[in-house]
UniProtKB/Swiss-Prot annotation:
Residue ranges of the region described as Disordered: 1-64
Protein's name according to its UniProt entry: Actin maturation protease
Keyword set, alphabetical order: Aminopeptidase, Cytoplasm, Hydrolase, Phosphoprotein, Protease
Keyword Cytoplasm tagged: yes
Amino acid sequence: MISPCSPPLEPPVPPPETPASQALSIPLPPLPLNLPELAFPPSSFQASVPPPPPLPPPPRTTGFAPPHVFGLEKSQLLKEALERAGPAPGSREDVKRLLKLHKDRFRSDLQWILFCADLPSLIQEGPQCGLVALWMAGTLLAPPGGTPLERLVQVAMERGYTAQGEMFSVADMGRLAQEALGCQAEVLCGGLGGPNRDHVLQHIVAGHPLLIPYDEDFNHEPCQRRGHKAHWAVSAGVLLGVQHVPSLGYSEDPELPGLFHPVPGTPHQPPSLPEEGSPGAVYLLAKQGKSWHHQLWDYDQVRDSNLQLTDFSPSRAADGREYVVPAGGVRAGLCGQALLLRPQDSSH
């Protein structure tokens, strides 16, 4: 997460071997007191005694337990709970479920066009949300097979972008993406609104991913906490409310009347983008590292959350852990910024 992150686990130090002089011994059973009454002589009795059982393993040394990793237990519990809930749904099925769930939010005076690239899900280990979001985006950018998350973590640490997995700089995230994924990276400054808005929407309509820092609410949706809950998400889908759907290259959803999709493999005319002053006309489909599922966020809500990332969390500042924060702090590293990623051979 942009929130504090766990230091990498170190392999536990094996316990020292138990010297032979300290080996445990199992005493033989005591001889009966009245040997003459036995049917066999003492020598025969001793010969019939079975050999002692093997020695038990030496006790574990208690002084070399693995170091405590902040947040790991919580993230493991989250992963186990999500795994018990069942397999992660396919991307398209998950999006369809989400749209059905929220269909009452959509303005009835508009028709809706969905552009959405398939993104896998990955649950973060501790607060590595930015690197997890980059990994998800990388599946649309890197060669088949993608780039392992471990590689992203390794490069980020080697370059000094992170101490524990945290990423407080959009510029550093862009440099990491270029090196580790071999893609184009454009740092967007000045917020997601104004002249940047159409640029962002056209980027997603073209099927390219967008990395967004924002403040995370309890339900993972954007909120405004002045950067104290800074988090990362990736968006590769957008739902546009338009007055008219272009006639070329779109088909209506059979289950959701009024929703249209571009027909795969068919040229389609780009729609007219909703005006910025039109409320409830643009929604981003986003994923982040604490859920298997897509979320549907009002574009203006994301814009406003991204634009107020100004302060480093006081609880992080007091927790005694090391963080890599750029000169100028959270405001300089995250506020009003986002990262647009494209394959290396893509034109703008």
